[in-house]
Amino acid sequence: GGPYTPAAMKAIFRGCGYTDMAREWGFSLYTECRSREVTLPRARRCRQLSVAEPFLERDYLIDLCKLKTHGMVGFSGAVKNLFGAVPGLQKPELHCRFPEKQAFSEMLVDLCDFLAPDLCIMDGILAMEGNGPTGGQPRQMGVLGASKSPYALDVCGTSLIGLKPESVLMLREAHERGLGP
């Protein structure tokens, strides 16, 4: 969660090769970096937070995530990936507001339920295990998964890496709310 500024976004797009790709293929990249404070009507833990505008002004939301373990919540897949909708430096703020694993996991489910992705795709071709999100080791898995349900996809993902889905607090929370398997 670094700064959510036009300069930062342009540098990221340039570094990833997206600027050249956009020029070649004739599409635009969003660099305005606007966000809005939103109310999450069905939330149990976090009723208000900021969300980047592209997540709010959309026709369709595809959640493209990597299969990986995570130091705080145990697993990072489709549900955790949507934390990317929270603008840059507001992410550490939410970590401070919800420092316990249970509370943070509940906030992630609140956000996922609000954003309601239309399609989730999990890239597990080269997964990551260890102390994620950045401290893990690459692991060749050779799998790709997709689902309309971020919760169902994450249950499959946890099973693939040998975790019991009920041991992942956000998946247990989603199940208790009737959102996932």
Predicted regions and their residues:
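N-terminal and secondary-structure boundary signal
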Residues: 1-181
